[in-house]
């Protein structure tokens, strides 16, 4: 049972870290297709989407 609690605590601590590789760029958008060329220009890869009016790119 102690091992379970230890693993649970480790899992909680690891989940609190921000491990995402997403990059918000300061480009306004109304749809995800508008972000693709902007992400290609900013990070070199055309992978992104529009969230809350801003482009979010994924390397």
Swiss-Prot record:
Alphabetized InterPro entries for the sequence: Scorpion_toxin-like_sf, Scorpion_toxinS_K_inh
Positions of the UniProt region annotated as Interaction with Ca(2+)-activated K(+) channels: 48-55
The keyword Zinc appears for this protein: no
Pfam family of the protein (one): Toxin_2
Signal peptide: 1-22
Residues carrying the site annotation Aromatic residue of the functional dyad: 58
Protein name as it appears in the record: Potassium channel toxin alpha-KTx 4.7
Organism name: Tityus stigmurus (Brazilian scorpion)
Species classification: Eukaryota, Metazoa, Ecdysozoa, Arthropoda, Chelicerata
